[in-house]
Each structure stands twice: as structure tokens, then as C-alpha cells.
Amino acid sequence: GLPYPKGVLLVGVQGTGKSIAAKIIASEWELPLLRLDFGRLFASLVGQSELRVRKMIQIAEALSPCILWVDEIDKAFAGAQSSGDSGTTSRVLATFITWLAEKTSPVFVIATANNIDWIPPEVIRKGRFDEVFFLALPTREERQAIFEVHLSKFRPGKERNFEIGLLSELSKDFSGAEIEQVVIEAMRLGFNENREFTTEDLIISIQKSVPLAKTKSKELKALKEWAESGNVARASKY
């Protein structure tokens, strides 16, 4: 007798695996994954944007059960409080959240966001999503696991040749996506010298990289404070 789950909102800085989480959920549940780019729904003609939203809803419900992945929902509604678009953003927002709150079809919504300040309070309010998860930067244990994943992908069976414990210590504040780029850059260093890349190449790559957490430290701090002050679940088990 339980109603169908509405969905989840995944909030975190870029590169923490929000998009990957959406794809993994769809794979685990063996359901089709529909990706919605809200930016493409907005049109210049009055009323056309709302019509596109309703069309999107019709398609999702016709394909249900399915997963609707709303990527970077914060950017879509960043202008909801302004009057520069003649209220189009507000009307699109109203259409979407009304459907989200009242829908009875088995469409599971996974929305991702980088900047919580851009998300209207109506979207986060109880009853819209079943849960709001905060995806923090990976811990040392998680960074070690991420290095293992990428090293085993690029050098199957040889990941133990690298000092992964040391690498996880040196890559503090790196996101999962940034760790992947560290590995790719180290591979380039080895390729340029016609040899296999080593732990030393990975260390050099780490030292040359400036993680987003450093360049946007204020935004990250605000995001952490928001996560700690509200009814938000942490996605990490550590």
C-alpha cells in the first residue's frame, strides 16, 4: 500500500559522483534512465517553456517505470527569484514541483545540484523528494578506493604496483573526478618518455593539480554548513 517513491536530491561540489550515482541506480534497478537538461526547456515564446515541461512529464510517465535524472537543477532555477524572464522560470518551477509533489506514476526523480543557494526553497521542502543527500569530498579511505578503481581500469592487475596509501594521503581535498585526472596526467608523463607511469608520476601530477576545493573554499564551507544544519543525509558511510 506504500506510494511510489518520489526521488532524491543529490547535492555536492563538482566531481563527487552525483552523475555516476544516477547511472548506477538505473543500472542496479534495471530501469531506463532519462536525462533532463532543464536549460533546453526554456524557449523565447511565452508559454512554450511550460508546454515543454508538460511534454517532458508525459514522456517520462509513458516510459515508466523509469528514472528521470534532472542534471544540475540548481542552474535551471538560478533565476527563479528575478524578474528578467517575465516569470517564465517561476512558472516552469511551479509546473515541475507540483508534478513532483502530486505524481502517482512510478517515475523516480534523481536531481543533482552543485550550489544549494540557487535552489528555490520550494524544491527542497518536505514532500518533494524522499531524501536529500550531501556528497562530501572523499575521505582518505574513499580516495584510496578511487585510486584503486582507476588504476585497475587503466592497468588491470597492476594496481598493487603503486603506493596507493601514500597517494590517498597526498590527494587530500581532491574529488573523485580530480583523482581520475591525476591518473590520466601521470599516464601522459610516462607516455611522453616512452615508459610506464609510476607512483612518482602520480605524485607529480597531484602536486601540479589545484583541486576545486581550494579555489572555491568559501562555497564548499557554506555547503558543509548547510548540510550540517539541516535534515540532510550524508552519502558517505565514513
What does each model-identified segment do?
Residues G1-P5, V13-T16, I20-A21, Q58, ...:
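C-terminal engagement/docking regions of AAA+ P-loop ATPases
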Residues G1-S168:
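Walker A/P-loop NTP-binding motif of AAA+ ATPase domains
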